[in-house]
Every structure is written in C-alpha cells, then in structure tokens.
Amino acid sequence: MAITINLRATWGQYAPWLRQEHASLPPVPGEPWSGHMGVFLHYLGTGSTSNLQTEEDCRRAVAGVYEDHVNSSEYEGDIAYNFLVCPHGHIYQGRGYERGAGNAGKAPFIEGVGRNEGFYSILGMIRSQDVASEAMLRSIRNLIDHLRHEAPRKTGKIILPHSFQYDTECPGNLHMYARQGTTIDPSAPWRGPADIYVYRTQKWVNATYIAAPGYVFCPETGYTGWNTVLSLTQGLQHELGISPTVQNFGPGTFNAVKNRESVPEFERNENLLRLYNGALWCKGYWASQFLGGWGEESEASLRQLYADMGLDHANAGQRLAMWPHVLKSLLRMDQFRLVPGGDPHVRAIQQRLNARYVAGIGIPAMSLVPCDGIYSRDVQQGLMMAIQYETGIALGSINGYFGPGTQAALKGRGSATLTGDLRYLFRAACYVNSPTYTANGQAHYLPADIGTDARTGTHVGWLQAFQRFSQLPVTGHNDYATWAQLLVSSGDTSRDATGCDCITEITPQRGQLLKANGYHIVGRYLDEHLAPGDEGYLGKALKPGEPQAILNAGLRFFPIFQYNGTELGNFTYDKGYDQGKKAHAKAAEHGIGAGTCIYFGVDYDATDEEITSHVVPYFNGVKAALAELGSRYTFGVYGSRNVCIRVSKDAGARWSFVSGMSWGFSGNLGFPLPENWSFNQIHEYEFQAGWGLDHNIWRDGGDPGVSAVGRG
C-alpha cells in the first residue's frame, strides 16, 4: 500500500540547535536486526496530548521524544521508535527500516527472537488520557500493511503491546488494538475506532467473574456485542446470588432484579453499579467513567434511556416497576435511538407499544420492544400482543402468535368498526407494510393517518391499493383477510389459490386432481443434486415426459432450481454460475421455451448482510451463466420478502416467488411484498397421502409460466 513517510528532517529541524543535524540525518543501521516477526505498539506516557493541535505541534513533539531518548544510554543515542504516528494520521520516520531500541530489549525473547531484533516499534502519539483518532488508526493499519508487503525488511503477522511480558502501562489506550485481528490489522476487516469504556467494561467483567460458575469470557475488543452483554448478564446473576450463571436474562434473573426493589440511584452494591454503567456504555450512552459510582452523568443517561423507550422516568412508581424490563433491554443488543435507515414514525409506534402495553397494561409475556425505527421480529411480536389485548384475549393467554384464538378475535372484534387503540394498531400495521404498489408505482401510507380516528380518503385509498396488490378482495375495510395479510407474510392461509408447487412427480392422474381442485399452475424442480440411494435423495426432479403430462391436464408449470439452498455455503458467485448453466441445460432438455423464468431458491432466513455477501453474488453468477448461453431463459428468486426485494434490485431477478408461509423469517417481517411478486407460497399441506403440496397465490398478470414445450 502506498503511504507517505515523513523523513527525519521534517521533525529534526525542531530539535535543539546542536542536535538538529543528527536528528535530521537518515537512521544508522544497527545489529542484530531482521524485523521479520511483527510490530510492537507504544504510546507517549501519562497525561494528555491536547496540545497537539497542528502538524507543527506534532513535529515538535516528535523532536521532544528524540531529545528524551538521545540523552539516555538505553536507546543507543537516537530516537527509539521505528515510526511515529500522530493524531492527524501523519507517519514520521524514527529509526525507519533499521533496528530500533524501543521494545524493551532485555525483556524475554519471543519465539527465540529478541524484541528489538525481530520487531518494528510503532509509537501512537497519544497519552493515558487520550484515545486514538480514526486517522491515527488508519495510518497505523496502512503502515503495518506497508511493513508486511513493501518494506525493504518485511515484517510478520504479530501485533503486540509494549506491555507484553513486560511491566509497563504502555501503550495505554492502544492496548485494545495491540493484537492480531483488530481494526489496525490489515488482514482483518476495518471496524473503525473501538470504545475505551466498553473495553474497560470487558476487562473488568472478565477479571471479576472469571471464576463464577458457568461464566463465559467475553472478547476484550472495545466493541460491544452479544458476547459482552451476555457476560454482563452473568455478572448480574452472580451478584444476585444465582448460580450457576447462564448467558440468558430469563425469568429467574428478571424476578431477582424485581425482588431487589432498587433502582441504580439507590443501589449500594458497587459491582452492580459497575455492571449498570458498563451496560450503558455498551448501549452507547455516556455513564460514569468510574464504573463503581453512580453520578449525575449515569442518572441523566438513564433518564434519557427511559424516554427513548417511551417510559416515564419522572414517575417514581413506573421507574421502579420498569427497571427489570429496562435492565433486561440494556443487556441485549436492542437499540432505543433512531438508527441509520430507521423511520421516526415506526419509532413512535414502538414507543407507544412500550408505554401502553408494557408500562401501562403490563402484559405479562411482553418485553420492551426496540425503539430504533426498524420494524423487526421483536416489534412484530409486540404489535401482535397489543392487538391480542385490544381484541379481548385474556392477559394470561397473550403470546404474540398468530394462532387460532387470535384469528378468531380478528374475525370478530377485529373486523368490526374500529376505534381508539385498536384502530391505531390497524393503521400502524398498514404503515409498517408500506409501500404497496399501484399501476403508477409506489403508494406510501400517510403518517398523519396513523393516529387519527377519522376514516380519511388517503387511508381508504391506500388500503384498497394494498388489497388489490396483495390479490385480496378490495373492500377498503379491516376484514380478516386484510388483517392477516398485514400481520403475517402468509396472510389468510385458507384463501383460495390457483398455484402450487411440490417435489412429487405430476402424473396424468395427479394433474387431473390438481385441476379439479382449482389449481392452474404447478412449480416443479428441474434437477436434484443428490443421486438415488443417497439418504437425502427426494426424487424431486422433473421426469421425462412429465412436462407434457402437466400440460395435457390443462395446467401450466413453472421451473424451480435448488441445490442445497438451505445452506449459506451454497451461495457464491462460482456456484451460481455453475448452477445457472445446469439449469439452462435441464430446461432445454425438457423442451422449455425461450423467455421462461427459472426460479432459484434461497430456502433459509438469509440476513441482510448474508444477502449482500453471498446471495447477490450467487445470483450474479446465475445471470452471467444464462447470458453466456444466449439469455434463452430469465431468472427469478425464491425466498423471503427481503431476499426477493434485494435480489430483484441488486441482481435483476425478473420475478419473485415469496416463501410467505415462513412467516417467522426475519426477512418476512417489516418488508412489503416485492413489487415483482408472482407467487406467494402461503400454506403447506398433505394433498393426498404421501403427496405434500405448497399452496401458492398466483398473481394475476404475473409470470405466465410454461404453456407449451418443444422437443428437448
């Protein structure tokens, strides 16, 4: 990597006059020296570098380090460090590529190699009260990459703090970066600056509870995550007398917090205060820098957290009653401030759910929902519980599931004229399912319609558009089918559908049965990657002559291709390219005509990150293969709503086949039906003994499927 290293002369001019010439000269070679092992990180010592405002300040500071070292016999008459990196990200030459003297050469050897003989030394120009700037960290990362790949004497993979096997506080707050795999390691992903208070929390919780039964050590990285908050949870359990500790904030932990009847401002157990402060730091709220104290900084952040959750901190009774809920949420990765991509109107819905149904009604099964503006699985479950309450389901029976009791309640009270809170919840469900689509493009639900009791024209218009797009009866009313479509991706699973798919061969007799039961199109698999005799073999592939048998029964069919679509490892560009070619060959073998859409399956709950890293590249491979073979066939995608939306947008899928019956998938929560949906798989059932069938809504004007075949 090309980097700029400022030579000694840039700072040598600031050395005392009698030493300026020596300070500015190139470094003198020293022996023994190889530098092949790695790097040590250093800092300037105690205090603050708040005086390093300009680059001239930094050059003077480097000259000051030189002056300290040149007067000491310990450093062999020169500045000790090979390179120095300032807060502005500028890199300065010290000993450069020659042997340095800053790594505590008399300390124990590492793998038989002396610390000054085998390691470069890099000084980050911070002191004990400072944290490294992003510019400094990026430059250290780039410098290490340069030393590994471009330096005259290339170094190895090791990254260590000066304190490794040596009694020193150095490198101060750079400790959390001074190892392999951190953000300064060019072989690891860039993560940006870590949080020193999260790091100190991680160090403290590990040191304090490592001997507690069941305790799991959390990585000391300075970045929060599930590992950290679960270790904090175990620390909490230990302080509350729960043993062995477990990585779960369950009913036992909740009740132990509740029975303590104390909020942080009145807590006298310093370890509990350390846990609470650490949890605030991990959640991104400022807290006491002394973990064992609870001052105004911590209390102010807690007040803000209550407000962010939609709770009333000023109400002493509610503050105490909600504390177990608040602490449980603190010790999770839920966010309560608007995150990038979050919607403030969704956040208002989330806060209202917390205020009314957790703090107000006190639904026993309901936890605080995140308030980040993202409609997630937990928020969907909270909304479902609120609807269950407002439709008359007993508190003890509320569970957040779209089961028979909920369905019956929605067919009754839910389908009557709505007022008050139930009307609000219905309209909130409309908003989180927005946009829907019309012939003119996207139709967004108006935020102003969420909280009004008026039956506005904009509300009715959107609702009718949603029903029409979802292929429901267009009533403009809160009927059961509409409720179901708003709440779960499968919608009303009892509704009629003209599409289906299966792994079973469609014989002439089976084709006639499908036709007689109202089906007009069936999805069938082009191939199977397992051979007969394999324990996982399903026999799902189209059989010779089967396409014509389907057509002779008065049906159409649509081709599906899926090899190991349930595993992330299947989704790479190369596998997509290979499977695209196989799908083309199989479709042509069966005489399927040009222009047909082949659906490639993503049959698991792929996260947004996995869609970006694996699924989209896979479909780009499919696209390249089909194009290389003349673009005889187009490609579609089978998967959750989010998978279908992303693959259609980022890879160009023609049609979407939505796995709507997987209503628990995160990719089916908070995402609308894709604009290009053609099939919505809503129900799986046994059509006949041994013949399982998926019940699919086939969209009017969608993919026409295959209506004729030629010779293969």
Residue ranges and their predicted role:
Residues 79-91, 160-166, 224, 294-297, ...:
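Acidic helix-start/capping segments at beta-turn-to-alpha-helix junctions
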Residues 173-178, 605-629:
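Active-site cleft segment of glycoside hydrolase catalytic domains centered on the general acid/base Glu
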Residues 170-521, 525-530:
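Cell-envelope/ECM-targeting effectors and their regulatory/trafficking segments
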Residues 37-43, 80-86, 90-94, 119-124, ...:
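Structural recognition of the beta-strand scaffold that forms the well-ordered cores
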Residues 534-606, 610:
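Substrate-binding cleft of extracellular glycoside hydrolase catalytic domains
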Residues 58-65, 140-141, 508, 539-544, ...:
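Well-ordered, non-membrane alpha-helical segments in soluble/globular domains
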Residues 1-115, 169-170, 482-565, 654-665:
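N-terminal catalytic cores of peptidoglycan-degrading enzymes
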Residues 1-48, 87-193, 625-704:
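Basic/polar, cationic surfaces and motifs that engage anionic cell-wall
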